[in-house]
């Protein structure tokens, strides 16, 4: 037993010494600067792109990627990157392709320490492009406003996505870990999928909306969905304020749902296993709310025919006629008033 314990402690000591050595080596290669500006392992580049293109594909391993409108009418790519992962730029068949070339040695692969952040910033001179496709592993992504894209597809492993532009036909964002923020005046079909992270939509107009997440909060403010909106989640709250849609559906397992000034032309439904549902001045052609554990309370703007059921909980709803409002809870009170 003592021999096993001694061997374990020896292995731990070796691991600590190895990590300390990697730390010192990386700091030395960064010119003994924690901001990495003096590092010999990094390089700053600036490249002007003169060929014409209508589509853009970006696949880099920099920490941060930004796509911005060009203020001087010049298409330009600025990067600060590791020398072992340089980028390449080419225009083929009307498509601008920006990608990295993997040249990592063993040290770069096993070293966990990084004292500087790399980035790539693309400045676009036009105000409309057919497609923007971005593949990114780790780092934040910004797509600034001022440019229209017909179609946008973003795939990110770890990092935050901020999309402030317009995707006229469709917008698809897929992330594993990180927050997603969207502000768009005119976007078509919007599909957002994330495993862990918050999703926020503000001051936006989309044709349709499909949100799917496992863990995280959904917040929508001043949002217009011209057709159907679907929000699916496992754990996390949903907060909607000043939202309109043709049909609105919220389905999740755990988390509170708060709706303020939310309107659906045809059908509005909420399905929740655990969590409160709070309504403040909402309305729809038909309303369906079903929860297992959690109360349903608030106000509806117009009179409804209430069909309510609670296995364990107090019920207090108006005796009015109108379109159907069906509310069911297993454990939780139901209290609804008409008016704001």
Map each language-model feature to its residues.
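Structural signature of tandem-repeat unit edges
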Residues: 163, 240, 259, 279-280
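Acidic (Asp/Glu) and glycine-rich low-complexity loops/linkers
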Residues: 1-60, 64-156, 162-175, 181-194, ...
